[in-house]
């Protein structure tokens, strides 16, 4: 594939300056990440790319020997998170950059090694010029941080429940980069619950003072409004099980043993996941069951798509149960991935019909789960727009009849979004029209549902050039192998180009590059 000993050095130019001469690439000054800045830069001449062995020790030796490229030795400030081997036989070492042993929030470095044990790419955020210590000390315990986070969101731990899912609340000590380039210790607190309403909170608590630095509800939506009409009424096959003298919507047919389970909340917003949908016969035909039938059938197809194309076993690739709850609330105009499961409202009849009736929306939500467990793109600004875009793109890969997203559930307009023509639904289709919206709930966290139109159009350009079969492999590899939580549009472009080169060679990589050039990136 023409890799040889070429090294693609990926560094966040906002964290360190590289004296590398590249056409059209300039290092950023200071510590403020530029929205259109790539952290996937190319460098041909290196001291050594061949590893003595494909392991953590050898990778760090490589980084040390190439310290001139990185403006210092990054090996001492990287902690191995995981190492994986992909279907091509390539190995990928994912590291967390640390300050005084504490991981830096939303930053990763990935070292990529080919089958000949040559390093062919490095990408991520090195923070190689960071201070040796943080500006503050740890005085608040993790238990106290969790309590402060609950207070900040106005909830009591006893007043919320995660239903049948495991308690995933946690407080992890992280180093947070400040605007002046220094670092502070803070707890990255995750609070997830499904009642009295779905929430997936991230709260940053200063580890010294206990002050709240940031709080965000990251429940990820396919849409903000909806409508409600009856479902299509088509007859579809269902994988069910027989339990306690009745048939239930529990799919046990998957060869990996992963279960797909569908519940009915009966218009409640509490006691999730709800009641397991059941029938005295093998048929589920009542009008109240139709939303559940669609959710169950569509999610089975989405699971099959990810498994047959990528051998991915559930959203986390660990075989976790895939849970859906339908009839969430009364006229609830949304579908959402809550961090542990999917919920579907019935809509209000004016904009949406029941949201479980759309295959591409189901795929969109499932992909949020995949993203959460891989690139974990932060849900704001460009990373958040990429999060939404990758969900839309895989929504299309699951439902290739047209380029629209949500066309089966909208009532007052043809669809929610369009990959081929984002401007049809008030989205930009070129970076020149990027909308700098506030990073608030009212500003859609920097326009994650708005600016996703730009990478969506790039995806359309890619698919029309390469076809679905190649494009879906390229997009999956980029999402699971190269992207990191803080990846920007430029990073996504570089990751997709590299993925195309890995899989299909330089000709197709050039087509991906052209697809992104066409949207101003």
Swiss-Prot record:
Documented EC number(s): 3.4.24.28
Summary of the function given for this chain in its UniProt record: Extracellular zinc metalloprotease.
Binding positions (Ca(2+) 1): 360, 399, 402, 404, 407
Propeptide intervals in chain numbering: 28-221
Temperature dependency: Thermolabile.
Official protein name in the record: Bacillolysin
Residues binding Ca(2+) 2, per UniProt: 399, 402, 407
Species name: Bacillus subtilis subsp. amylosacchariticus
Family: Belongs to the peptidase M4 family.
Principal cellular location given in the protein's record: secreted
Gene Ontology molecular function: metal ion binding; metalloendopeptidase activity
SUPFAM superfamilies given in the database record: Metalloproteases ('zincins'), catalytic domain
Keyword vocabulary terms for this entry: Calcium, Hydrolase, Metal-binding, Metalloprotease, Protease, Secreted, Signal, Zinc, Zymogen
Reaction(s) catalysed by this chain's protein: Similar, but not identical, to that of thermolysin
Signal peptide boundaries: 1-27
Cofactor: Ca(2+); Zn(2+)
Catalytic residue positions: 365, 449 (proton donor)
GO biological process, one term: proteolysis
The organism's place on the tree of life at top rank: Bacteria
Cofactor descriptive note: Binds 4 Ca(2+) ions per subunit. Binds 1 zinc ion per subunit.
Binding sites annotated in the UniProt record for Zn(2+): 364, 368, 388
Any one of the GO CC terms: extracellular region
